[in-house]
C-alpha cells in the first residue's frame, strides 16, 4: 500500500478569512495542520523609508495607514516620539482629547475584530451589530477631522482643533432610510460632539450586552474557541506578545497602567486578564476592554465639559498660528509659511515612544539628526510578533481552527507589512 504523505495547501491571500493579504502555506496531515508558514510582504509600502523623505508633519498621515483600523493610536505614538525629542508637552485639554480618542479608537478596533472574527467562524449577525456602533464612532472622527478613517488629527504639541459644538447631520430620507429613522439619527446629533459621545457611552453597555448574548454562552461559539490556540504566560512573554494576546494568557501588562502616558494615571479603569490563554479568553478580554474604554471615555467627557482651554502649544515654531493672527500679523504669516514649506527642525537625538494600542504595544523609534525630516523611523508593530506565533498556535489543530486563530490574533496587514 502506498505511503500517505503530507500535502501542502495555500490559504489566502484571496481567502475571505485571511484578513487582507495573508498567505499561509499549510502542511496538512489529512485535515490536521502540521506546519503553518505565513508569507508576508504583499502590502509593503515602504512607510519607514518614505517618512525619511518627508517633513515630520508630512509623515504623520502615513501613520494612519499602518493599522488602518486603529488610526489615531498610530498617530499618538508618532507625535509622542516627536514631543520627546522636542522636549514639549501638549496642553492638558489636548491630552484628555487624545486619551478620549484613543479609547474611541480602541472600541472601533475591537468592534471590527469581534465582528470579523465572528463572521470568520460563521456567526454573521454580530458583524452587522458591531458595524452599527462603528458608524457612530466614525462620525466622531468625521466631526473633528473631516475624515472618517485617516484623520491626521493629532499633531506634535496637541491636536489639530478643539472639539466642535455641532455634529454633521444626515440628509433627507432616501430609499435606504425612512424619514422617521433619519429624524431619530439626527436627534442624537443635534448637540455638540461631547453630547453625542456622552449619549453613545450611555447606550454602549447595552450594545455590548447584545454581543455577549449572541456569543458568550453560545454553544457553537464556545466549541470553536475554547481550548484552541492555547499559549501559556511564559511562552506568551517569550514570543513577544502584547495587548489582549498577552493579557488573554493571564499576564496583567498594560502600558496605560505600567507606564502611564498623557492622563491615563488620572483615569479609573481596570485591566481585564484571561485565565486559560485560549481564543475564548482573548475574546472575553476584548469584550471587557470595550466596557473599560467606555468608562474612560465617560470620565474624559466629564472633564472636557468643565475645563475649556488651549488644545495646542503656543510655540509657533512648532504649531501653526491661528488663521486670524496669520492674516493680521506679518510675523505670524512668516511662521506659517516656514512651517508649511520647510517644517520644524528637531534637535539631534533618538526617542522611543510606545502606546497601548488596541492590538498591543505600538512603538515608534525615532532618530533625528537636527534636520526637518526623520533620519530613521522604526515602527514596532504588535501584530508582527503575534503573526510569527501562528505556526506554534495552529500546530495539531484542524484547518477550520486556523481561521479562528487568525481571527483571535486580530491581524491587520497595514502595520505588519508597513
UniProtKB/Swiss-Prot annotation:
The listed locations are: Cell inner membrane
- In the UniProt record, does the keyword Membrane occur? yes
Which PROSITE patterns does the record associate with it? Answer: COMPLEX1_49K
Catalyses: a quinone + NADH + 5 H(+)(in) = a quinol + NAD(+) + 4 H(+)(out)
EC assignment: the record states 7.1.1.-
Please give the family membership noted in the entry. Answer: Belongs to the complex I 49 kDa subunit family.
PANTHER family registered for this protein in UniProt: NADH DEHYDROGENASE [UBIQUINONE] IRON-SULFUR PROTEIN 2, MITOCHONDRIAL (PTHR11993:SF10), NADH-UBIQUINONE OXIDOREDUCTASE 49 KDA SUBUNIT (PTHR11993)
HAMAP family cross-referenced by the UniProt entry: NDH1_NuoD
Q: What is this protein called?
A: NADH-quinone oxidoreductase subunit D
Q: Which organism is it from?
A: Bordetella pertussis (strain Tohama I / ATCC BAA-589 / NCTC 13251)
Amino acid at each position: 500500500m502506498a505511503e500517505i504523505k503530507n500535502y501542502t495547501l495555500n490559504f489566502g491571500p484571496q481567502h475571505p478569512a485571511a484578513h487582507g493579504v495573508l498567505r499561509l502555506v499549510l502542511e496538512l496531515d489529512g485535515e490536521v495542520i502540521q506546519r503553518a508558514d505565513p508569507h508576508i510582504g504583499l502590502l509593503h509600502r515602504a512607510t519607514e523609508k518614505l517618512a525619511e523623505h518627508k517633513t515630520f508633519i508630512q509623515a504623520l498621515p502615513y501613520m494612519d495607514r499602518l493599522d488602518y483600523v486603529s488610526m489615531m493610536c498610530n498617530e499618538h505614538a508618532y507625535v509622542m516620539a516627536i514631543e520627546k525629542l522636542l522636549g514639549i508637552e501638549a496642553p492638558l485639554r489636548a491630552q484628555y482629547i487624545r486619551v478620549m480618542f484613543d479609547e474611541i479608537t480602541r472600541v472601533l478596533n475591537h468592534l471590527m475584530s469581534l465582528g470579523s472574527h465572528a463572521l470568520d467562524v460563521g456567526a454573521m449577525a454580530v458583524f452587522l451589530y458591531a458595524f452599527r456602533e462603528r458608524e457612530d464612532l466614525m462620525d466622531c472622527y468625521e466631526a473633528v477631522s473631516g475624515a472618517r478613517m485617516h484623520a491626521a488629527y493629532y499633531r506634535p504639541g496637541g491636536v489639530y482643533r478643539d472639539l466642535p459644538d455641532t455634529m454633521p447631520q444626515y440628509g433627507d430620507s432616501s430609499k435606504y432610510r425612512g424619514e422617521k429613522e433619519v429624524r431619530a439619527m439626527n436627534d442624537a446629533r443635534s448637540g455638540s460632539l461631547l453630547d453625542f459621545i456622552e449619549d453613545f457611552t450611555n447606550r454602549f453597555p447595552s450594545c455590548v450586552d447584545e454581543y455577549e448574548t449572541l456569543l458568550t454562552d453560545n454553544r457553537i461559539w464556545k466549541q470553536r474557541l475554547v481550548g484552541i490556540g492555547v499559549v501559556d504566560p511564559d511562552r506568551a512573554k517569550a514570543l513577544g506578545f502584547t495587548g489582549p494576546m498577552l493579557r488573554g494568557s493571564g499576564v496583567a501588562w498594560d502600558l496605560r497602567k505600567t507606564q502611564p502616558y498623557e492622563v491615563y494615571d488620572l483615569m479609573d479603569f481596570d485591566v481585564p486578564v484571561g485565565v486559560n490563554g485560549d481564543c475564548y479568553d482573548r475574546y472575553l478580554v476584548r469584550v471587557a476592554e470595550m466596557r473599560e474604554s467606555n468608562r474612560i471615555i465617560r470620565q474624559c467627557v466629564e472633564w472636557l465639559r468643565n475645563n475649556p482651554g488651549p488644545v495646542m502649544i503656543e510655540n509657533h515654531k512648532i504649531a501653526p498660528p491661528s488663521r486670524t493672527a496669520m492674516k493680521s500679523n506679518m510675523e505670524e504669516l512668516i511662521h506659517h509659511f516656514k512651517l508649511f514649506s520647510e517644517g520644524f527642525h528637531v534637535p539631534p537625538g533618538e526617542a522611543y515612544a510606545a502606546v497601548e494600542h488596541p492590538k498591543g504595544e505600538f512603538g515608534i523609534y525615532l532618530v533625528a539628526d537636527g534636520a526637518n525630516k526623520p533620519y530613521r523611523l522604526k515602527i514596532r508593530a504588535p501584530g508582527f510578533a503575534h503573526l510569527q506565533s501562528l505556526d506554534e498556535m495552529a500546530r495539531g489543530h484542524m484547518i477550520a481552527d486556523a481561521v479562528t486563530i487568525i481571527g483571535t490574533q486580530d491581524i491587520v496587514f497595514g502595520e505588519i507589512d508597513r
